[in-house]
């Protein structure tokens, strides 16, 4: 039986009451923190209200945001007076605009997640060119604040996947070894449960480590997982995933290119030449015996035929749930009018002030290694919708919500989404949602939106 339809209530206030009340009593640590708060906290507050969090839980999460997250966002973005481009010194690999903050909305469960790339004023400078120090400090602070956070998995994966000081020095002395603009190695996220508990996650991107050691991303990721998985909980699922990756590398299951194949970018060269390439992993920061691992891979062929191949592991995963999920995924793809083509890794970021129309990137999948009896890890698809018209995308999502019986979401989501961006021209905006993910869990659709989470304030705002 499919899960109950998710909650969604209208929330269009420019200054939601919890945000307004806290703003009147906060002593900020710096002007940067104050500006980050007013640029982001109203969006978070509206998301919590519209997703029907209890009022006391809303205040708890906004307070957590102020005390833990704001100090980790680093210097506030600056607007270039000549180009009008708004950007931070450190370009975060978490967000295509380079910003270090992203709120995502799991609409299937009406749950909100806060993604953070913790930074300092030194991040991206010669003192800390790959931002290796601040994420650990941030997570250690989170572990002191939040019950149940266990950093064992973080330390284990950090040792295997993050460059050392000596390796950082090699990359600085030899810049041609790693020319990709995507330099983030550790990202973080907090799932805000409606009970008031928080699930903290860490994400590891080993491309700098790959460049300096000469080991492939796949080799680094797979060996790190096997090293921490001492009881072999993930072995069957991981081995089947590796077999699929190897078949793809040998040229099996590959459709014809649907568009003129563009040349590889500098970011592409950090990965396998195969169109389907291992990318990064994430882990829950709970006690190791309960921690899940998700293995992420990207696909440059963005079309439904390739989605179906990955979803079924080349036709090997064909249990009833997999096929029901695939049928629903086909409707989802059609409803959002997903574009298709061959998309390389972007040449660089699309900072605020640049045109986002037509911006393209590969799609991604994560494979959930959970230690269950299932021989294949459950996949979740992420399609890049940055560069597609944001209003049309939300209209397509509304069509899908009605298709699956999410009437409250269909009635209120579009208005709630647009309320987060009061100064945007929705006929032109193409950057308000970066990715949409789809999975099939517990007999129903599982959809998450990764949304733009920043409205500039003060002298950084766009001129009228």
Curated annotation (Swiss-Prot):
Keyword annotations from UniProtKB, A to Z: Aminopeptidase, Hydrolase, Prenyltransferase, Protease, Transferase, Virulence
Residues annotated to bind brevianamide F: 94, 102, 205
InterPro entries linked to this entry: Aro_prenylTrfase (IPR033964), Aro_prenylTrfase_DMATS (IPR017795), DMATS-type_fun (IPR012148)
Binding residue positions for dimethylallyl diphosphate: 113, 201, 203, 294, 296, 380, 382, 446, 450
NCBIfam families: arom_pren_DMATS
Function: Brevianamide F prenyltransferase; part of the gene cluster that mediates the biosynthesis of fumitremorgins, indole alkaloids that carry not only intriguing chemical structures, but also interesting biological and pharmacological activities. The biosynthesis of fumitremorgin-type alkaloids begins by condensation of the two amino acids L-tryptophan and L-proline to brevianamide F, catalyzed by the non-ribosomal peptide synthetase ftmA.
Protein's UniProt name: Tryprostatin B synthase ftmPT1
UniProt organism field: Aspergillus fumigatus (strain ATCC MYA-4609 / CBS 101355 / FGSC A1100 / Af293)
């Amino acid at each position: 039986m499919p899960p109950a339809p998710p909650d969604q209530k209208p929330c269009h206030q420019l200054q939601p009451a919890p945000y307004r009340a806290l703003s009147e009593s906060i002593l900020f640590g710096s002007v940067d923190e104050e500006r980050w708060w007013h640029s982001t906290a109203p969006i978070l507050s509206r998301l919590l209200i519209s997703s029907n969090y209890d009022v006391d839980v809303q205040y708890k999460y906004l307070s957590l945001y102020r005390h833990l997250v704001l100090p980790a966002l680093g210097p506030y973005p600056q607007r270039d007076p000549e180009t009008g481009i708004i950007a931070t010194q450190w370009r975060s690999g978490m967000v295509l605009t380079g910003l270090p903050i992203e709120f995502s909305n799991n609409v299937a469960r009406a749950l909100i997640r806060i993604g953070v790339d913790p930074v300092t004023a030194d991040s991206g400078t010669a003192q800390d060119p790959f931002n290796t120090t601040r994420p650990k400090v941030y997570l250690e602070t989170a572990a002191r604040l939040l019950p149940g956070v266990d950093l064992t998995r973080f330390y284990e994966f950090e040792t295997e996947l993050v460059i050392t000081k000596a390796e950082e020095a090699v990359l600085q002395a030899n810049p041609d070894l790693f020319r990709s603009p995507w330099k983030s190695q550790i990202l973080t996220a907090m799932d805000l449960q409606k009970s008031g508990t928080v699930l903290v996650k860490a994400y590891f991107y080993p491309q700098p480590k790959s460049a300096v050691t000469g080991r492939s991303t796949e080799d680094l990721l797979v060996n790190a997982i096997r090293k921490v998985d001492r009881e072999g909980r993930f072995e069957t699922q991981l081995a089947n995933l590796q077999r699929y990756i190897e078949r793809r590398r040998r040229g099996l299951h590959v459709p014809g290119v649907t568009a003129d194949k563009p040349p590889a970018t500098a970011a592409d060269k950090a990965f396998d030449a195969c169109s389907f390439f291992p990318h990064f992993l994430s882990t829950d920061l709970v006690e190791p015996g309960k921690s899940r691992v998700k293995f992420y891979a990207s696909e440059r062929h963005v079309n439904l035929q390739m989605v179906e191949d990955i979803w079924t592991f080349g036709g090997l995963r064909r249990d009833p749930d997999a096929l029901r999920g695939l049928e629903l995924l086909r409707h989802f793809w059609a409803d959002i009018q997903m574009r298709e083509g061959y998309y390389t890794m972007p040449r660089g970021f699309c900072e605020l002030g640049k045109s986002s129309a037509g911006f393209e990137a590969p799609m991604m999948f994560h494979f959930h290694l959970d230690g269950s009896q299932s021989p294949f890890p459950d996949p979740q698809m992420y399609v890049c919708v940055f560069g597609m018209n944001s209003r049309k995308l939300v209209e397509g999502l509304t069509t899908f919500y009605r298709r699956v019986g999410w009437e409250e979401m269909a009635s209120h989501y579009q208005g709630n989404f647009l309320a987060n961006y009061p100064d945007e021209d929705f006929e032109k905006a193409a950057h308000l949602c970066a990715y949409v993910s789809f999975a099939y869990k517990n007999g129903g659709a599982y959809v998450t939106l990764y949304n733009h989470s920043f409205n500039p304030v003060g002298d950084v705002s766009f001129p009228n």
